[in-house]
Amino acid sequence: MAFDQDWVPKTRLGKLVVEGQVASMDEAIKSGLPIREPQIIDMLLPDLEDEVLDINMVQRMTDSGRRVKFRATVIVGNRNGYVGLGQAKDVQVGPAIRKAIDAAKLNITYIRRGCGSWECACGLPHTVPYEVTGKAGSVSVTLIPAPRGLGIAAGNTATKVLEKAGIKDVWTKTFGTTRSTLNFAKATYDALNQVNVVRLPVYYGKEEV
């Protein structure tokens, strides 16, 4: 993604990034400071990719009549653990997409990966480390560790979210109205976030001597 050379940071974290005191996303997250400027992500993750998942027209009745806006849902990620989901509305499609991209950047998080399938013992971070479930509205998505080489066994929307997070192999189980792209994407994103909720023992993944 292109970085805005004229950006003047307003937050403490933004100033630390420009000064070079925070040089990576890992350092930014560990600092405990909130990420409130999308330009921070542009600097720390220059290889970030974005993809529009859904554009929908929404209407609202007001005293002055019916108002129409476009709602855009966007996923961003570097295909190596960092992923974010965002949505925004605007009277035009272009601005709605740009706002959604900025929102996705501010929601970016690191997803822990591993080799959690009993059928595989490669030790590479190609799938989720254990089974997790995410929910959004009526949609429920369960991610199950898969052996290396299987690929992503999921619907189109979930596949886009998982690919941006760097997940290469995974089984999925879905329930509810998966035709709703927004809830399907949110449920998949929530499932990925559940990976970080579980606390693992310090010896997890280490061979016993």
From Swiss-Prot:
Keyword Aminoacyl-tRNA synthetase: no
Source organism of this protein record: Methanosarcina acetivorans (strain ATCC 35395 / DSM 2834 / JCM 12185 / C2A)
Source taxon at top rank: Archaea
GO molecular function, one term: structural constituent of ribosome
Alphabetized PROSITE patterns for the sequence: RIBOSOMAL_S5, S5_DSRBD
Lineage: Archaea, Methanobacteriati, Methanobacteriota, Stenosarchaea group, Methanomicrobia
Name of the protein in its database record: Small ribosomal subunit protein uS5
Gene Ontology process terms (BP): translation
NCBIfam families in alphabetical order: PRK04044.1, uS5_euk_arch
